[in-house]
């Protein structure tokens, strides 16, 4: 069983590294990250310190999209190719199949993130390299969380075009509209919602939690207070729990959905 699961992981990794859309988006990410590093290298010392926050903004936009694109066809793609039944007939459980596909794609995503940040790191000024290296693990957490969401979308959708539409919609929702919705909530309630509630809702979104953690990294624990937001940040244990939930729950739910679908037939 372990040998079959390992073969599935390797197969997914090789297939995704040959996916032209993933390659294109990864190259775009690497190019944009390199452009940020080039700007930091050519700018004065004061402007060079903006390279890290600029890279965080870029990552919070591009990496979730790459991850959702990478995960959106994990299950539904097999269904449309009529190979899902063959895949589920292997001597591994439904959950193990989903986890193997998820892990293989997570490795491919790690390669894409590594290439993008590696390109930026290679041409970054020496003073900014430590900061950029500190972005690697949080960026991988962000990407894997959205990859998990993409895998769940793939298990729910019945057609690949539907899964792609859902993935793009979720990207807009998590990256753009979520924060706008919270801002609208503050406006509608005339500030009646407490800052603690808003902070909790922001950190419940993986993209928002990533931005908050990176703001703390660059500005220190008092960074939000300096912006007039005197709210308690989630503890390290709570942040780890939020990340673990976003990363682990969607693939598990996907495996359960496959098991339920198989049982109905």
Segments (PLM) and residue ranges:
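Aromatic- and glycine-rich beta-strand/loop motifs that create alpha-glucan
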Residues: 1-26, 258-264
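Hydrophobic/aromatic residues in alpha-helical transmembrane segments
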Residues: 64-71, 148-149, 178, 206, ...
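A structural motif at transmembrane helix-loop-helix junctions in multipass membrane proteins
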Residues: 140-190
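Secretory targeting signals
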Residues: 35-38, 45, 52, 59, ...
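Residue-level recognition of transmembrane alpha-helices
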Residues: 26, 101-102, 135, 139, ...
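Terminal transmembrane helical anchor/hairpin motif
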Residues: 176-248, 252-253
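Helix-loop-helix units of permease transmembrane domains in multi-pass membrane transporters
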Residues: 74-106
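Long, hydrophobic alpha-helical segments
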Residues: 25, 54-77
């Amino acid at each position: 069983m372990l040998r079959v699961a390992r073969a599935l992981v390797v197969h997914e990794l090789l297939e995704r590294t040959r996916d032209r859309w993933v390659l294109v988006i990864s190259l775009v990410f690497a190019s944009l990250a390199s452009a940020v590093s080039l700007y930091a290298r050519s700018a004065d010392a004061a402007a060079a310190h903006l390279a890290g926050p600029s890279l965080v903004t870029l990552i919070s936009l591009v990496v979730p999209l790459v991850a959702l694109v990478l995960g959106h066809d994990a299950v539904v793609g097999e269904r449309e190719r009529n190979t899902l039944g063959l895949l589920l007939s292997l001597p591994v459980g439904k959950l193990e199949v989903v986890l193997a596909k998820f892990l293989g794609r997570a490795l491919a995503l790690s390669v894409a993130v590594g290439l993008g940040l590696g390109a930026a790191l290679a041409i970054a000024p020496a003073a900014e390299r430590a900061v950029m290296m500190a972005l690697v693990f949080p960026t991988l957490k962000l990407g894997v969380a959205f990859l998990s969401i993409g895998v769940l979308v793939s298990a729910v959708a019945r057609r690949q075009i539907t899964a792609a539409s859902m993935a793009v919609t979720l990207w807009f929702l998590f990256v753009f509209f979520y924060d706008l919705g919270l801002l609208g909530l503050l406006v509608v309630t005339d500030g009646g919602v407490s800052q603690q509630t808003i902070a909790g809702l922001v950190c419940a979104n993986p993209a928002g939690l990533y931005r908050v953690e990176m703001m703390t990294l660059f500005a220190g624990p008092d960074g939000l207070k300096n912006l007039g937001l005197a709210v308690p940040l989630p503890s390290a244990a709570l942040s780890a729990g939020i990340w673990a939930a976003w990363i682990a729950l969607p693939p598990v739910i996907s495996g359960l959905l496959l098991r339920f679908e198989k049982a109905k037939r």
